[in-house]
Amino acid sequence: TGIEWTPIGSTVNEDGEVEHCFSGKFYGNGYTISNLDFSENYGKTEYPSFGFFSEVHGAEISGLTIQGNLDVSNSEYVFFGTVAGVAVDSKISDCVSNVSFTDTDKYINGTVALCGYAINSTIEYCQNKGNFSVMKDTSQFWMGGIVGLAENSTVQYCVNTGDMTSWTPSSGGIVGFLTKSSKVINCYSTGKIVPLGKGTTDFGGIAGTVGAGTEIRHCYFAGEMDLSQYTATPPYKRLGGIAGGVSSDTPVFENNYFVKTENVPACFKYQDAGTEKTLDFMKTEDFFNEITAAGGNYRFNSNGTPILPAPKYSVSFVVTPAELTNVIIKVGGQVATNPADLEAGTYQVEVSADNCEVFNSNITITADTATHTHTIAMTYLPADYTKVDTAIGKVNALNKDEYKDFTKVEEAVNAVVRGKNITEQTEVEAMAKAIEDAIAALEYKDADYSKVDAAIAKAEALNKNEYKDFT
């Protein structure tokens, strides 16, 4: 048995309303929280939203793996998500769920997924490995590998490898119910699908049900469809390789593919929602080229179907001062755009600009959004003081006692301010000119004629007639 889990962010008042939710940042840094048992507290009235986190609002969760199990023992309405029951205005990224969900005989309502109910949120680079099984018919239940019910949300770069056995109204490999302009972009599912019942529920390889303004683009389903317990009459109207059902007539489908299964369309109402392929073909380089040429972002996998790219984050560089020209940013030795899409890791950054010293530093990128913006304060090149130093050299060579007034020269020298940068070169040139002008304005003192006058006085005191030659 696992450890009974009380969810984070689960304070509920007497009216059943969540008073306190998690609104911070949680970075798992790649660690796994294992051996969790969600069974005991599932369905309790104090946990209408349930998971590792109960409800998150304006939160960021990343780098976390959840491992555990849930065997349903209560029949209350529960938004269950292994990572978060409900996510509002939040971002969940780079998380992995490996939690099994089993309901054999309880009449349940709500959700099961990595994130149960996503509202105005983004879920990206996440994976579900857990198997989900709901063996009993339900009235309101949404099962998805990544999101159960998505409302005004985006699910992108996610994968489901877990198997799904379902009799729920809306079940999908990635999202159970996609509604209110939500999007599924560049996701795939390889888990086995086992639909139950007579074909009165929606089950899709990517989404169970799609609604108004929703989009599914660049996705593929490459899992097995086990129809051994499905008693609907073909052609199947609510079972699809891409989407099971459509609740509104305005969804958008682009560049989607699904594995060929007899009598199973991409979507009964939108036959062109996806293109049928054999599983063998989907493992070839030709298929990789086909899906990527049309806009899909995948990596070729020689051992199977295409896989997702490594997580990338949009990293912005704020270079100051803002008025700099010819700014060039290099990341890892390569010229980069701004913002730049970077994988997690440490990079050497070099920034150059006109009249500035070259900036060099290392930056570390993680899922933490605080690492996605870097302010770089550039340092201007120093001003050229050559003319100032030359002028001061001239001053030092002078004997100030030879001049009537040396004050202006000394004032000009004392007015020199060191440490100016190249944008202040004009001021430095003015300092040099002030010194040169002061030197040019110097006036020598009058010569001392006292000895001359004394000698003349002696000469005038003589009687030249007393001398042979007074010339």
PLM features per residue range, with description:
Residues 1-314:
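Surface-exposed repetitive/solenoidal architectures
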Residues 18-22, 322-325, 344:
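A short, compositionally biased
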Residues 19, 33, 336-337, 358:
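Short, isolated positions in well-ordered beta-strands
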Residues 64, 347-349, 431:
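Contiguous beta-strand segments of beta-sheet-rich domains
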Residues 313-324, 352-372, 377-471:
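Beta-rich interaction/scaffold domains
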Residues 322-337:
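Short, ordered, surface-exposed loop/turn motifs in non-cytosolic proteins
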Residues 334-354:
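Short Pro-Gly-centered beta-turn/loop motif in secreted/extracellular proteins
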